């Protein structure tokens, strides 16, 4: 996918680099696969109106596309009708048309194109875009959209350019290596999609100006040292050095403190990403 650099016709255009994909559909999304929910309009507030997630607010209105993460339509092949941009995620999406007339969106894998046939099931061929239980996928294969519980739908490796490698099998479990370096066990009957997620060049784009980030619903991040003592533990003082270990606005250590609290699933992690 070519990356173009914009001409410096203004300070906001000087450093902009964009991805150009001529295969993406230019029209409206498939209407029956749109949710009534308008995404990212909470402003980071909960039902009491209090901020629970900082740095969220504004941005362009966007409709949520209903993505098929379960890939449970077995025995019926589908053809890729078009590839589309999805404002809710970094990956592109593909519109599938099944032989029985049903349409579904999936994450667009790398190296698939319009007109390709895709299927799911226990005995489908090993090729990018096909979904099947991991017990039927060869060791060493690259996969994405991996389930953590059978039938729940893919939860791992869903962003642009991400993938997971199957490294071994241990009885009822498959041993997977994640991009973070973590190695974990997941049950063999969990489904995964062959190949890696497309649009890996997404990370090479440059927005070029702060306003482009605001279009996406991201608000500014203010340094703690620039605040007053009432607002942040790093605030106040005459100089820039705050003279203590860095902490969050609520006094929790930010450098190296473990935050994982789900001890119930620790037994499935064979090697943590930090080791």
Curated annotation (Swiss-Prot):
GO molecular function (one): rRNA binding
SUPFAM superfamilies assigned: Nucleic acid-binding proteins (SSF50249), Translation proteins SH3-like domain (SSF50104)
Biological-process GO terms, alphabetical: cytoplasmic translation
PROSITE patterns: RIBOSOMAL_L2
UniProt key word RNA-binding: yes
Pfam families: Ribosomal_L2 (PF00181), Ribosomal_L2_C (PF03947)
Keyword field contains DNA repair: no
GO cellular component: cytosol; large ribosomal subunit
Region (Disordered): 214-275
Composition bias type Basic residues, residue spans: 255-275
Keywords: Ribonucleoprotein, Ribosomal protein, RNA-binding, rRNA-binding
Signal sequence, start to end: none
Family of this protein: Belongs to the universal ribosomal protein uL2 family.
Subunit structure: Part of the 50S ribosomal subunit. Forms a bridge to the 30S subunit in the 70S ribosome.
PANTHER family: LARGE RIBOSOMAL SUBUNIT PROTEIN UL2M, RIBOSOMAL PROTEIN L2
Function text: One of the primary rRNA binding proteins. Required for association of the 30S and 50S subunits to form the 70S ribosome, for tRNA binding and peptide bond formation. It has been suggested to have peptidyltransferase activity; this is somewhat controversial. Makes several contacts with the 16S rRNA in the 70S ribosome.
Name by which UniProt lists this protein: Large ribosomal subunit protein uL2
Organism: Blochmanniella pennsylvanica (strain BPEN)
Gene: rplB
